[in-house]
């Protein structure tokens, strides 16, 4: 198994208005974004080209908003990891374009 391009654990994953997990995992691997529960069960996944992500004006520096398969998720993680997630998602999408 290849090493993921990005992986963050302990992520709070919310689908408005409820929290799905407080200790989930966000993983970018093989051109796909996967949102996982703390037990490793998949919440949602999609090819990185189909994912929209960014920072919302109302979210703090530790949060990102991602739209996966038409569903908006709020991902709260350490501030440095949040920026790293957005950058890794952009890089992965660029890598898919080059292949």
Where are these regions (language model features)?
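Anionic N-terminal interaction surfaces
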Residues: 1-27, 83-94
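Short histidine-centered beta-strand/loop micro-motifs
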Residues: 17-19, 37, 56
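Short aromatic-glycine motifs in intrinsically disordered, low-complexity regions
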Residues: 32-42
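Short amphipathic alpha-helical segments, especially helix-boundary/capping motifs
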Residues: 6-9, 39-40, 63-64
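Acidic, Ser/Thr- and proline-rich intrinsically disordered linker/docking segments
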Residues: 3, 34, 45-99
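Short, mixed charged/polar active-site loops
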Residues: 21-23, 41-45, 72
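A short, compositionally biased micro-patch
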Residues: 28-29, 38, 68
């Amino acid at each position: 198994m290849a090493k993921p391009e990005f992986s963050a654990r302990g992520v709070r994953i919310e689908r408005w208005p409820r929290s799905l997990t407080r200790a989930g995992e966000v993983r970018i691997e093989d051109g796909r974004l996967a949102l996982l529960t703390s037990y490793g069960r998949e919440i949602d996944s999609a090819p990185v080209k189909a994912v929209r992500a960014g920072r919302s004006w109302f979210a703090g520096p530790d949060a990102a908003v991602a739209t996966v398969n038409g569903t908006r998720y709020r991902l709260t993680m350490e501030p440095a990891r949040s920026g790293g997630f957005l950058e890794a998602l952009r890089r992965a999408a660029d890598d898919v374009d080059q292949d």
